[in-house]
């Protein structure tokens, strides 16, 4: 890591390391926002701003990819919490016309079954199989213990086995 490549407020992060994982970070952000590209771009940009300003500080306790995925995950959760609050407030004032977000383009039986899983099971399956994280790293991204992550992972595999064997 060259000195000129290091972020001023995050000495363990380099621009080149962020560039190397950008595609994976963007893919993870897309999955956090129902594949809305503009929202995913905002999430990634906000994550990078937090890294640049030092608001999110990487200490090297995990891989950079795991850390940045965690930042994106937490930003998405915060965004949807705020959005849910606004919707609840709007519902008190008037009956809003709320439509469900569109689903990703892949309609295979497997991904339909994955989308039907509970949120944490769905997240761990995506992190492990699509984002190439270990169960331990995925657990850190999700903010749960490794044991809890393993339980969600095992339950997800059993549920998928059951759903796919009936189709």
Task: Identify the role of each PLM range.
Residues 124-128:
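A short pre-motif secondary-structure segment
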């Amino acid at each position: 890591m060259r000195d000129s490549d290091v972020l001023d407020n995050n000495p363990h992060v380099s621009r080149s390391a962020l560039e190397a994982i950008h595609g994976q970070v963007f893919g993870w952000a897309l999955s956090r926002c129902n594949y809305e590209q503009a929202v995913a771009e905002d999430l990634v940009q906000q994550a990078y701003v937090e890294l640049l300003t030092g608001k999110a500080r990487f200490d090297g306790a995990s891989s950079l990819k795991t850390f940045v995925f965690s930042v994106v995950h937490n930003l998405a959760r915060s965004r949807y919490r705020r959005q849910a609050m606004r919707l609840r407030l709007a519902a008190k004032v008037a009956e809003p016309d709320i439509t469900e977000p569109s689903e990703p383009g892949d309609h295979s039986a497997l991904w339909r079954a994955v989308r039907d899983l509970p949120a944490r099971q769905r997240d761990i399956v995506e992190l492990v199989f699509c984002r190439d994280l270990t169960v331990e790293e995925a657990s850190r991204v999700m903010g749960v213990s490794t044991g809890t992550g393993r339980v969600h992972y095992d339950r997800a595999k059993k549920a998928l086995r059951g759903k796919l064997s009936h189709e």
